[in-house]
Design a protein with these regions (language model features):
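Radical SAM enzyme [4Fe-4S]-AdoMet core and its adjacent flexible, acidic
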Residues: 12, 33, 109, 118-120, ...
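Conserved alpha-helical substructure of the radical SAM core
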Residues: 1-113
Length: 203
């Protein structure tokens, strides 16, 4: 029987996060505080609806779970156990601060396919955008995936702040044997449109 085409959904389950990135739309208010997340019963209801949709479309479900940092979701392991029971594979978009060998192994056993973190420039630039120590923590966390079936991914949100550092950043990502490296377009707030990269600069 031929494998069905995947139906992928990116799912924001929590606002909880260790970082306060300059470009984050969740924490862009003056108080920089936001703790919204979905309770487990709501997640289960949405999941069932998603699975019914996949069945109707004759597609295999795949979830890209994000936040915030999904590892900070209070019942993340209960939720991932449900996904395993339903035979739903998933990827995570998160931070490096709650990863270790045991966490990665647990994620692998529950059906995690990939784990994406961010590098928004070289050390000084990245730490300015995200938080001090984040650059080294991200590179250090990649070691936990060595020998794992989980593929690693690095995403860079490109702005005028970091565009000149992209070539050197590519070398660093290759050196650390990251499986996938991608770019996201910077979405400016009203006060920082000057950081937006022009189409000509992207070329």
């Amino acid at each position: 029987m031929a494998e069905r085409t995947k139906f992928s959904m990116q799912w924001h389950i929590t606002d909880r996060c260790d970082q306060r990135c300059k470009h984050c739309y969740i924490y862009e208010g003056k108080d920089k505080k936001c703790g919204l997340e979905l309770d487990l019963d709501t997640l289960k209801a949405i999941l069932e609806d998603f699975l019914r949709t996949c069945d109707k479309l004759e597609r295999d479900p795949f979830l890209v779970i994000t936040g915030g940092d999904p590892l900070l979701y209070e019942r993340i392991w209960d939720f991932l156990e449900i996904l395993k029971e339903k035979k739903v594979h998933f990827g995570l978009l998160g931070n490096p601060f709650h990863l270790d060998y045991d966490v990665v192994k647990r994620l692998e056993n529950l059906g995690c396919i990939n784990f994406q973190m961010s590098l928004d420039g070289l050390r000084e630039t990245h730490d300015y955008i995200r938080k001090p120590g984040s650059f080294d923590a991200t590179l250090d966390a990649l070691k936990y995936f060595e020998g794992s079936k989980i593929k690693t991914a690095i995403m860079t949100t490109v702005s005028k702040t970091n565009i000149a550092e992209i070539p050197e950043l590519v070398d660093i990502v290759v050196e650390h044997k990251v499986s996938n490296f991608g770019f996201a377009r910077y979405c400016p707030n009203p006060e920082d449109f000057d950081l937006l990269v022009s189409p000509e600069e992207y070329r």
